[in-house]
Amino acid sequence: KVVKGKHHPADFVLWRTAKPGDLQQWDSPWGRGNPGWHIECSAMVRSLLGTEIDIHTGGEDLAQIHHNNETAQSEAANGRTFVHYWLHSAFLTMSGEKVSKSLGNVVYLSDVIEKGFHPLALRYFYLQAHYRTPLSFSWGALAGASEALNRLWKLSRDIAHESKCKSTSSEARNRFLAAIRDDLATPQALGHLWETLRSEDYAPEEKWGLLEDADAHFGLSLTTPPT
């Protein structure tokens, strides 16, 4: 069934006619009303970032409808490419359910800190999975990430004592950067980091150079570990 006023079944709402009691409504050439869901996002992007942006993120559930519609209306209005790179992330789950405000199962950073974890442990936890791969959160999994990060920090301190300067080029650095450039393959990049730091085939200077590169991309305080 095609809604009255549509020219095509795939048409989506750009402007909604106001209903009695609507808290948000404005005058427009099409009558008093409020913008459609997709228009809200296009308007915010244009107002704050401009008509063309490099990276747009969002959940995987927004890819097929919302972001396609957002692109269609933005490019029609502005006459230029809307987004150069889309990053659609898979869901974070907990006990088999998607983490969401509507379900009331959200974990806040303050909760993480109250349980004694360093905030960067949560970042490390996220980096262990590719952004397009579902990730299951538990306090046990976060504890494992925290232990791994603490081991990385210890390795960093040990290497800092041995290293005299940074090596600007190495095969290890190239492997790490290749993983990052491959659709942000952070699990593989972390794997290369661990492999290099544990190996005896690389000089301390090469390891320190890789730690600096990893820190620039991950922000894990690898070269300035907390004491």
Label the predicted regions:
Residues 98-100, 105-227:
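Structural preference for alpha-helix termini/caps and helix-kink/transition segments
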Residues 1-158:
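Alpha-helical recognition segments enriched in aromatics with Gly/Pro capping
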